[in-house]
Amino acid sequence: MNIAQLFVIVGPYYTVPVTRGSPNPRFLRLPQRLTKARKAADVTRRALEQKAGGTNGAILYIEEGRRVPTVETVARLAHALGVRAAWLAYGVEELDAAGFRSTTVGMAARLLAVRAAQQLSRAELGRRTGLSPRAIAKIEAGGQSGVDVIEMLAKALRISPAWLAFNEGPQVLPASRRGRPPAQSPADAR
């Protein structure tokens, strides 16, 4: 089977399944944030690839949503653009980095510490995320993973994906305000 036949069967785009009625994953807006930051920095795709050490076409594929980057790639892109990786990957924290360099150093230790604190086995975390225990072990051993996988792990552990990946922002995201706030007095309940 050649690549042309594969595209006919699978299609040229990498799609991420989204459950209807639940909030979209934060990383899905990464292509729009990357395009916005690149244009604000007045940098071409090619120049950004060279500055961040990427491969030919990588920025185009990410901006078109055809590729989900690793957290390490996002950290390099964020540094090249002068923005925070937490903002670029997940829309968390602020846009401006102001001399700050995002890094994924310590991600493995943070994942292991949170999993141990919650007394979860790799198998149980795997069931919650759909990942294999071996995949979780590889990340805990220092392996890199996509921003989508890190967000799945963070959601299952009820922590911030930006904190897990880049050690930026609070460990736990504030609860989103959906729906009507609770009644403050009996008169408000009517």
Provide a role label for each language-model segment.
Residues 32-51, 76, 107-128, 152:
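Short basic helix-loop element that most often maps to the first helix and adjoining turn
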Residues 65-79, 142-155:
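Short, basic-rich loop-to-helix N-cap that marks the start of a DNA-contacting helix
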Residues 82-97, 158-174:
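Short C-terminal boundary/hinge segments that cap the last helix of small helical domains
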